[in-house]
Amino acid sequence: MTKKKKLTHGQVRRVRNNQHKKLKQEESIVWDEALLGSAQPGLVITRFGQHADIEDPVTGEIHRCNLRRGIESLVSGDNVLWRPGAETLAGISGVVEAVEARSSVLVRPDYYDGLKPVAANVDQMVIVSSVLPELSLNIIDRYLIASETLGIAPLIVLNKIDLLSPELREQYSTWLNDYRAIGYDVLYVSKKTGEGIADLEVKLRDRTNVFVGQSGVGKSSLVNALLPELEEDVEEGAISETSGLGQHTTTAARLYHIPSGGDLIDSPGVREFGLWHLETDDVTKAYVEFRPYLGGCKFRDCKHGDDPGCLLREAVSKGEISALRFDNYHRIVQSMTENKANRQYSRSKKPICKSKLLASLEHLLTEGAIFSNISRPSPLYWNVNHG
């Protein structure tokens, strides 16, 4: 296979300028009401900028539509009312008029924009982890907090298990059995060997599922395994040799129909899942194994640390609560506190140019400067200090 020639900086700049002009042209389209049909239901497949791909539930056809002004929060999985155009103008064939009420919405905190919707009307959150990049139980716990808070059923999937030796697989099973013990489903899968794919299909059937997890854990590879009939495979990411972190592939969440039943939404990978928008009590209640003990501590304001008479700590000492989960709980609460303090401090400072900041971060990530000095004594604690 011939390697693609790398574009020069000038070529990249011209491509971006052409794309920008095209988007401006599409956004400037004003439909004559006489050219629009009657409103009908549709399903959002993906959204980018002021446009969205809407599926007609009757024909299954996909229509690229403009969004009416005032429609801002639109994500994959949303049910909408849209009006088809009598003709296609600059690739646009309709207009989204309204968004129907959601049964659920997965959100994640954005440092600049508050809570950012990721997917709507989700029945199940598929938390994809893998053995490469290293397994982080802390990130699994963060997603479980999100799922419990939002009322979305979680499913834990450990991917790339073909890379595990028998000894390591036994160790990973020991860690993940703590989650099975408190009622969470855990699957071991491998696209390479096919192990667990059939079981995963059964778990996804008749549900709208959102795939979440770090970049590089293989979410897109699982999408390809579940959707073998895709004309073009979803791009699969590699692992940075410098940082050991996954490189982002999916740039916008997209909904797919699974041939064996159910839908799935492949979301952009995140390296950590911030929870600073939640209160400590929300996090505490999201730990399902804590609930029988809450309210029984000696002190009403017990922080569940070294406080005397703490029922949670007593339960940990008796083996009734996982020590690893309990330790992650304190790490998460601490990181939330630190991140909230940093956020409040940054608001009091002069605003920083977002584009310049992102460009600097992109450069650092490319050069492997960020995270390159993180000590990784155990996969249990990797990437745990981000709120």
From Swiss-Prot:
Q: Which SUPFAM superfamilies did the record assign?
A: P-loop containing nucleoside triphosphate hydrolases
Task: Extract the GO molecular function terms from the UniProt entry.
Answer: GTP binding; GTPase activity; metal ion binding; rRNA binding
Q: Where in the cell is it found?
A: Cytoplasm
- What family name appears in the similarity comment? Belongs to the TRAFAC class YlqF/YawG GTPase family. RsgA subfamily.
Tell me, which GO biological process terms does this entry list?
Answer: ribosomal small subunit biogenesis
| Cellular component terms (Gene Ontology) | cytoplasm
What name does UniProt use for this protein?
Small ribosomal subunit biogenesis GTPase RsgA
Q: Which organism is it from?
A: Vibrio cholerae serotype O1 (strain ATCC 39315 / El Tor Inaba N16961)
Which Enzyme Commission number(s) are on file for it?
3.6.1.-
